[in-house]
């Protein structure tokens, strides 16, 4: 059995070990690649300040690249008896390089090691979320333009209210995603700061060069105060969780609309049969399970900030093992959101729109506001026009004019999709993912 990094001359009770290690062997697999990257930057810095020999650094870097390749292929395993990813990487180095492998922990604690792992992992996952959001955004804009002239009922209180259009409906969710991207950008900026060198939260007596590791890992800056660097554990996850929940909120609302509009009582949209599921007893059923699951998964993701906050709610300054539990809800959340985004983009692309909804006379009353406005424009006081049209509706005498003219910004006739796209592009341009990507490629020699 591997010796623990903190092991002394006594053996820990097996049940205590099981309870305290928890799911780390499983969850730390998410962090394996990033633990290697952090170690590569750290030992490069150690060599520069004389804590590693010039002949040792190339050997350690070469072996770390081998471990990275193993993790990249999904073959990295944390062995029984090994507590976490940090211990496993050090064990693998020591098995290959002997005592040289034991030197990589100089000037470092598992506290700042897991902090940098989490930040490297999170910024990579945020980029993938951003990419997936943009794909869905593009699908929505395309559909909005394609069906910009197809009218549909707009609702308030789930009652037919005023004319809307599929151009507005698809475009509304596109603009919502453009706003959501601002939350993702803020989360990325707060994440992309280097905690490495803060050690256990109080720094080190070694002359560490934190600026160097910041540059090597492609961080925008560092978490300067070493106490705050440790305080940031949990806070970073909470901030990112809010961004995830914001995107999930858009998806959940859109999925509810799609389920409702797809049912026979509405019949506004139709899903291809290959995108639906059936019933074991009712042969006619074509169920929108994809949207139902997007809704449920997105609602679950909206609880993520509360889960993180409750775990860290009453913790004072410093590291506590409570923070380990955050990984259980935080690390898998990215995959869940990406899955929902990808499925939403796929199904929106396949969605068919009913272009003859308003042929049904049940929707005639929604043109009442248009009639009131026309009377008011022709000189009738608004309240008198309102009363006149209301009486016509009550008497069953209302004859709608369905030729509507909405021209102001953001209305049926002037969607402003170009402006919405501009909002999205402006936000995307401020992420600067290339700094992260170039730094990681350089570390790996790619």
Spans of features found by a protein language model:
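A helix-coil-helix interface module used to build multimeric assemblies
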Residues: 2-203, 208-214, 221, 277-278, ...
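Glycine-rich cofactor/substrate-binding loops
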Residues: 2-38, 99-100, 267, 282-446
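Generic, well-ordered alpha-helical scaffold segments in large soluble proteins
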Residues: 42, 63-70, 92, 96, ...
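A general structural motif at alpha-helix termini
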Residues: 60-64, 217, 273-275, 362, ...
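Alpha-helix capping and helix-loop boundary segments enriched in small/acidic/polar residues
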Residues: 105, 110-113, 157-164, 168, ...
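Short amphipathic alpha-helical segments with heptad-repeat character
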Residues: 119, 123-130, 134, 141, ...
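Conserved helix-loop functional segments at active or binding sites
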Residues: 146, 183-186, 190, 219-226, ...
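Acidic, glycine-rich loop-and-beta core segments that form the ion-binding/anion-interacting portion
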Residues: 217-305
């Amino acid at each position: 059995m591997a010796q623990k990094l903190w092991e002394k001359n006594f053996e820990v009770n097996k049940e205590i070990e099981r309870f305290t290690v928890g799911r780390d062997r499983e969850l730390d697999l998410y962090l394996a690649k990033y633990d290697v990257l952090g170690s590569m930057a750290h030992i490069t810095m150690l060599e520069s300040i004389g804590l590693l020999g010039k002949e040792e650094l190339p050997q350690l870097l070469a072996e770390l690249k081998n471990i990275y390749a193993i993790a990249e292929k999904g073959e990295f395993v944390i062995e029984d008896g090994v507590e976490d990813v940090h211990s496993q990487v050090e064990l693998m180095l020591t098995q290959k390089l002997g005592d040289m492998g034991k030197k990589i922990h100089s000037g470092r604690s598992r506290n700042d090691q897991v902090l940098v792992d989490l930040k490297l992992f999170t910024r990579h996952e945020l980029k993938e979320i951003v990419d997936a959001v943009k794909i869905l955004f593009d699908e929505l804009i395309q559909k909005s333009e394609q069906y910009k002239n197809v009218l549909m009922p707009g609702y308030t209180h789930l009652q037919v209210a005023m004319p809307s259009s599929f151009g507005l409906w698809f475009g509304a969710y596109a603009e919502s995603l453009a706003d959501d991207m601002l939350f993702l950008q803020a989360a990325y900026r707060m994440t992309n700061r280097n905690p490495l060198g803060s050690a256990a939260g109080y720094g080190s007596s070694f002359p560490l060069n934190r600026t160097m590791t910041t540059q090597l890992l492609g961080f925008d800056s560092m978490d300067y105060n070493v106490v705050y660097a440790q305080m940031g554990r949990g806070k970073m996850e909470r901030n990112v969780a809010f961004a995830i929940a914001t995107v999930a909120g858009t998806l959940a609302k859109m999925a509810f609309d799609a389920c409702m509009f797809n049912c026979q009582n509405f019949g506004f949209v139709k899903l291809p049969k290959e995108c639906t599921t059936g019933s074991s007893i009712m042969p006619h059923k074509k169920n929108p399970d994809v949207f139902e699951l997007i809704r449920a998964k997105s609602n679950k993701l909206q609880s993520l900030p509360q889960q993180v906050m409750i775990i860290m709610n009453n913790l004072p300054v410093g590291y506590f093992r409570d923070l380990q539990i955050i990984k259980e809800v935080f690390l898998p959340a990215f995959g869940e959101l990406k899955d929902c985004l990808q499925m939403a983009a796929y199904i929106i692309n396949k969605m068919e729109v009913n272009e003859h909804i308003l042929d049904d006379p049940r929707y005639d009353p929604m043109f009442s506001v248009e009639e009131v406005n026309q009377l008011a424009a022709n000189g009738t006081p608004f309240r008198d026009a309102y009363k006149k049209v209301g009486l016509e509706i009550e008497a069953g005498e209302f004859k709608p004019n369905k030729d509507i003219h909405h021209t102001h910004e953001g209305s049926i006739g002037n969607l402003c999709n170009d402006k919405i796209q501009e909002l999205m592009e402006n936000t995307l341009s401020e992420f600067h993912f290339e700094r992260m990507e170039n730094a990681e490629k350089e570390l790996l020699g790619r």
